[in-house]
Each structure stands twice: as C-alpha cells, then as structure tokens.
C-alpha cells in the first residue's frame, strides 16, 4: 500500500538515496532542508520530489516522518513533531526495519563504503531485480526486488539497528574523533555490528584491527596475500583499469577487469566477488558486469576543461587521500599530480594533522583550502590550515575561492580536488578560470 513520507533533511546523502528508493517503489515522497545547494538534490529534482524549506506546515499527522541524523530538537519540524506527539523515525532506525523485507547486502568500513556499495549494486542489479541505497545520494527501489544493497555507516554507531544477511567490512581506521575515543573504540563498534550479520561476513584480511573481529556468522577474509579465503593475484594495473584473477580454496574462480584505478578498487572488487560467490550468484555474470561499472558520484569523478584534467573526490581522511593519489598516478603516469585539499572538521584536522601531511606528500604539489567546520563543532582557534601547510614537505600553499590562479603554474598536470566540505566551490572557480582563458585565447 502506498504511503506518504516526509524527510526532514532530505538533502543528506543517505536521506536523498532513501527518498529516491521509496519514490520509485510507488510511495509519495517529499522533504525539507536548508536552502544551500547540495549535489544530492539534482537527483531528487529530476525525480520530481518536492524539496521545501523547513516549516511546521509541512507536517500532517497522516505522514510517516523520517528524520536525518544531523537534525535535533532545535529543528522547527522535529520540535513540532515532538510537541504534537507525531511519531518519527531516525534514518538508521527506519532502514533497520525496512531491510527486513529483503535479502540484504551491507557494506561497512572506515573507507571505501560508497565505492564498494556502488560496485555491488551495479553488478547485482544487472543480474537480478535489486533495490539499493548508496552514500553518494543514489537510490533505486523496486517493489518486486528480492535483494537490497546498502551502505552501513559506523558514525555514532548508526549501523547498530542493521541485521543484514551479508556484510562486507572494507577496513577499520580511526576517524570521527568527535565521537570515537580511539582505534579500540572504533573496533569495538564494528565488532558489535559484525555480531548482528546473519549469514556471512567478508573482511579485508590484511587489516590488523579487522582480524580481531569475532562474530557468530562465518568470516571470509579477502586480500592480496596467501592465507586469505579469497585472493586477488596476477594483477595488471594500466591506464584502462585493473585486471586480476581471484582464487578460493586453491581454485581459480575467475578472471576480472574493473575500469577503476588504485589498489583499493581491486580490493573492493574482490570483496564484491567473494560476497556474490558465497551468495550463489554466477561468477561469470559477475565478471561481465564488473567491466561496465562507471563509478559513483564524487569518487574519482573526472572532467576535462580546456584540455585540463580535473578529478573530484570525496577523500577527507589520510588513507583516502593516499588511495586517490595512487589511482591518479595509475591512470596518468606521465603527468604531475596536483592535489587541492580541504580539511574537513577541526577535530579531524587536529587528530590527524601529521597523517594528513604525510598523505599529501604523495602528490607532486599541494594547495590547501580553508578548513571546513562541521555544523556539530565550533572553531576554537586550535588549528589553522597554515599549520598543515607547514608540515607538508612538497611545494604547498593556501588558496582562496576568490583566487585559485596559482593552480595555473603547472604544465602537464592532473588536478585532484579532495574534501567533504565545499571544495567544489574551489573547483568551480578553477573551472571558470580555465574557461575564461579559453575565451581570451580565441
């Protein structure tokens, strides 16, 4: 039966994906959010989903309310619902109930969740009817789907309402220092989550923290080294992507190609191959559809302006920065790699300052944008982006949105914009600068 859903904070990456999914399943969907433009709203607008400013008038008692995790009691719509005793569910609680109707495939991990969820969704939807929810704001819903693929987020232990049949865990790393106290706290959260997986876990076997995970369901380890249950080997990385074989229990189960770059994407693909193999999906079909994966939003997204290659990536943790630069070097081995990075949150910048500097030294030149503070924190003046610049060995400087012209001082370069804040404003400024150069040269 069709329902009416109202999303409070509909532009969030998970919320927008869920809204799209429910819309495609035939439900009436609307939502509210701040006026600022987010890349997620394009898909909502294309689907004809109404996006409203926050107002008490948006809510009627017959609606099912889904509230984004960033919105608390000081939001006027949340306050109205509480005052009038109109029930609502948080995003993760709704998802925990929703998945009970499907055979569910989850992807968890500190890094690589969105790319791996996108890859698993792409392969499975091309083999059989599948609903999915990806952290880049993409969602697909089918009333007849047997399978549901989704991204499982560890922040504030939001994945605890989830009890999937299968789950990949890509890695464990210290992140979200505003919530987690250290790596042991992160590992404990993942261990609690792992105990809820019903049929099987697929865990990166070369991660020391992940090796400590214990769960009632069988754990299959994947990676490059002997001793893993699923081993990627005979690897060839070219400017067209990555080719490799996978063996399980000493037997070759297939030869694969992914049009993606970086070692991390070979691992992501191996996790997907392992999961679908154990779930009984034809490996030959999996290999066919891996070849056609075009990526997910804001993960190594490329464009060319005035013969200049620009890469946009969500990387906002040192591990992700290293992986993104590695991918850029694989695809463009003869070009200078210029990194433009915006630190995301003051707490993360303070906690990982040395690691950020070390990661950015993998680039040939570095430009830094001002730190993007989270809505959850206040700038106490404890760290400035210049503190990071001082620790970087490679040539580096701070740029502003108004003046990105120093980026023009490079020939034969690939420009890699990385961050989870508003780094795209800097990217757009650079694109306008390049476009104006073209006009002036005509």
From Swiss-Prot:
Residues that hold ATP according to the record: 109-115
Pathway(s) annotated for this protein in UniProt: Cell wall biogenesis; peptidoglycan biosynthesis
Q: What is this protein called?
A: UDP-N-acetylmuramate--L-alanine ligase
Q: Which organism is it from?
A: Streptococcus pyogenes serotype M28 (strain MGAS6180)
The record's annotation in InterPro entries points to:
Mur-like_cat_sf, Mur_ligase_C, Mur_ligase_C_dom_sf, Mur_ligase_cen, Mur_ligase_N, MurCDEF_pg_biosynth, UDP-N-AcMur_Ala_ligase_MurC
Asked whether the keyword Cell division is assigned, the reply is yes
Cytoplasm recorded as keyword:
yes
Q: Which SUPFAM superfamilies match?
A: MurCD N-terminal domain, MurD-like peptide ligases, catalytic domain, MurD-like peptide ligases, peptide-binding domain
Segments passing through the bilayer: none
* A single Gene Ontology CC term: cytoplasm
Record-stated family = Belongs to the MurCDEF family.
Q: Which UniProt keywords apply?
A: ATP-binding, Cell cycle, Cell division, Cell shape, Cell wall biogenesis/degradation, Cytoplasm, Ligase, Nucleotide-binding, Peptidoglycan synthesis
Among Gene3D superfamilies, the record links this protein to: Mur ligase, C-terminal domain, Mur-like, catalytic domain, NAD(P)-binding Rossmann-like Domain
Q: What does this protein do?
A: Cell wall formation.
Cell compartments where the protein resides: Cytoplasm
GO terms of molecular function: ATP binding; UDP-N-acetylmuramate-L-alanine ligase activity
| Catalysed conversion reaction | UDP-N-acetyl-alpha-D-muramate + L-alanine + ATP = UDP-N-acetyl-alpha-D-muramoyl-L-alanine + ADP + phosphate + H(+)
């Amino acid at each position: 039966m069709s329902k009416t859903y109202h999303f409070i904070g509909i532009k969030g990456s998970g919320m927008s994906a869920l809204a799209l999914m429910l819309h495609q399943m035939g439900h009436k969907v609307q939502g509210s959010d701040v006026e600022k433009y987010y890349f997620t709203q394009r898909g909502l607008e294309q689907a004809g989903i109404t996006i409203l400013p926050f107002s008490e008038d948006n809510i009627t008692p017959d609606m099912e309310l889904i509230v984004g995790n960033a919105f608390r009691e000081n939001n006027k719509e949340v306050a109205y619902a509480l005052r009038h005793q109109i029930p609502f569910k948080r995003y993760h609680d709704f998802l925990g109930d929703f998945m009970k109707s499907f055979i569910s495939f989850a992807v968890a991990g500190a890094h690589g969740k969105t790319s791996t969820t996108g890859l698993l969704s792409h392969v499975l939807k091309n083999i059989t009817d599948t609903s999915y929810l990806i952290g880049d704001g993409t969602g697909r819903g089918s009333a007849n789907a047997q399978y549901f693929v989704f991204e499982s987020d560890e922040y504030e232990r939001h994945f605890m309402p989830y009890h999937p049949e299968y789950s990949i865990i890509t890695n464990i790393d210290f992140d979200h220092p505003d919530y987690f106290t250290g790596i042991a706290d992160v590992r404990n959260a993942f261990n609690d989550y792992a105990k809820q997986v019903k049929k099987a876990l697929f865990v990166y076997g070369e991660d020391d923290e992940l090796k400590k995970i214990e769960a009632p369901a069988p754990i299959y380890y994947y990676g490059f080294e002997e001793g893993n249950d699923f081993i990627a080997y005979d690897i060839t990385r070219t400017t067209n992507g990555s080719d490799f074989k996978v063996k399980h229990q000493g037997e070759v189960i297939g030869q694969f190609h992914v049009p993606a770059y970086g070692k991390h994407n070979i691992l992501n693909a191996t996790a997907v191959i392992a999961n679908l193999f154990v779930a009984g999906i034809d490996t030959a079909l999996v290999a066919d559809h891996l070849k056609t994966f075009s990526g997910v939003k804001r993960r190594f997204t490329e464009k060319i302006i005035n013969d200049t290659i620009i890469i946009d990536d969500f990387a906002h943790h040192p591990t992700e920065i290293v992986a993104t630069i590695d991918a850029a070097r694989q695809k463009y081995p003869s070009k200078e790699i210029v990194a433009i990075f915006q630190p995301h949150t003051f707490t993360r910048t303070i906690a990982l300052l040395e690691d950020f500097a070390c990661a950015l030294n993998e680039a040939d030149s570095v430009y830094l944008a001002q730190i993007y503070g989270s809505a959850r924190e206040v700038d106490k003046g404890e760290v400035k982006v210049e503190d990071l610049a001082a620790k970087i060995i490679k040539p580096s400087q701070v740029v502003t949105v108004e003046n990105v012209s120093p980026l023009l001082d490079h020939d034969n370069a690939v420009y890699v914009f990385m961050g989870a804040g508003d780094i795209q404003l800097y990217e757009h400024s650079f694109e306008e600068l390049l476009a104006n150069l073209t006009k002036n040269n005509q």
